[in-house]
């Protein structure tokens, strides 16, 4: 800062220089657009000096933050969604990078419907896809294989042999009339149905009027003479065993005569002796309250054994 100092050491700043400091120059930036911009002084970039008090808030903190007018559209928002800011060459390059939102089946259907006779060869389908969608011009190996797979596996595409009077190579592909209604605005909604699902879709017993369709799928009526049935002896034995367990919970008085005699304290049950270890009876004078505990140990072996031969 330039100033004038006298011999006594006091300095003063000229009035014109004070006004120049209060209003800094614009440094020749008036050639930019007239939109509102945010100017940051050097004080905002440098660290704040140490101060003893809080002091007033800086003046640049209340400055209006505005986006330059050159980045705003006519409506005040970013107008880049319609790609108007891109040149024609830039838009074409963007179309080469973005994949079209159509499935391969939709591309095939679009190509077939664009033909005058509604039929095209495989090479003509390739030409249609590559000519109308620049994305598929880069690599042809991947999507061409997908086109062939969709033609072979999708039931909506039918192969038509070439006539004898029609010279050329390859068969024609046409669209099934039943599937034309399912093609709407490039969205091929029909999904390929597997052959296994088609065979399983038939409901068994639907042709019989007696209402056999209520039977579960895969179940066939069994002949009681030919199909094996559970053993009657095993069922009777388990039924008797369940009855004995219910009676045991109520007390020994409700047990049958044979089981009550087997579960006595003087003699262990003969069927449990062959399959479970016996507990020696050291106290022949047990009270009736101890009988359930002593017998319950041997019955636990019968309950948790899974061989099925203990009863």
From Swiss-Prot:
Compartments where found: Nucleus
Keywords assigned: Activator, DNA-binding, Nucleus, Transcription, Transcription regulation
Gene3D superfamilies for this protein: Winged helix-like DNA-binding domain superfamily/Winged helix DNA-binding domain
Gene Ontology MF term list: DNA-binding transcription factor activity; sequence-specific DNA binding
Biased composition (Low complexity): 219-231
Presence of the UniProt keyword Acetylation in the record: no
Region entry Disordered, spans: 188-237, 263-294
Pfam families to which the protein is assigned, alphabetical: Forkhead
Portion annotated as DNA-binding: 99-193
A GO-annotated cellular component: nucleus
InterPro entries: Fork_head_dom, FOX_domain-containing, TF_fork_head_CS_1, TF_fork_head_CS_2, WH-like_DNA-bd_sf, WH_DNA-bd_sf
Role, per record: Possible transcriptional activator.
Protein name: Forkhead box protein I2
Gene: Foxi2
């Amino acid at each position: 800062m330039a100033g004038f100092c006298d011999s006594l050491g006091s300095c003063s700043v000229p009035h014109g220089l004070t006004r120049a400091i209060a209003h800094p120059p614009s440094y020749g930036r008036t050639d930019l657009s007239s939109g509102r911009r945010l100017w940051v002084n050097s004080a905002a970039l440098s660290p704040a000096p140490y101060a003893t008090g809080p002091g007033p808030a800086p003046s640049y903190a209340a400055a209006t933050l505005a986006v330059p007018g050159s980045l705003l559209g006519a409506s005040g928002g970013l107008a880049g969604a319609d790609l108007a800011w891109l040149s024609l060459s830039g838009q074409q390059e963007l179309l080469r990078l973005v994949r079209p939102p159509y499935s391969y089946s939709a591309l095939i259907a679009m190509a077939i419907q664009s033909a005058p006779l509604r039929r095209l060869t495989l090479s003509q389908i390739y030409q249609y896809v590559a000519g109308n969608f620049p994305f598929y011009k880069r690599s042809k190996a991947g999507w061409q294989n997908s086109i062939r797979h969709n033609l072979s596996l999708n039931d909506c595409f039918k192969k038509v042999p070439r006539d004898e009077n029609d010279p050329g190579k390859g068969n024609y592909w046409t669209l099934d009339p039943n599937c034309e209604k399912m093609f709407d605005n490039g969205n091929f909604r029909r999904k390929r149905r597997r052959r296994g699902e088609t065979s399983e879709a038939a409901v068994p017993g639907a042709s019989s009027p007696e209402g056999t369709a209520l039977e579960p799928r895969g179940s066939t009526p069994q002949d009681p003479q030919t199909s094996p049935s559970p053993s009657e002896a095993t069922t009777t034995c388990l039924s008797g065993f369940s009855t004995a367990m219910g009676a045991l919970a109520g007390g020994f008085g409700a047990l049958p005569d044979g089981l009550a005699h087997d579960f006595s304290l003087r003699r262990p049950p003969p069927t449990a002796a062959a399959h479970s270890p016996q507990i020696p009876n050291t106290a022949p004078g047990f009270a009736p309250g101890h009988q359930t505990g002593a017998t319950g140990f041997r019955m636990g072996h019968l309950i948790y054994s899974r061989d099925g031969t203990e009863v």
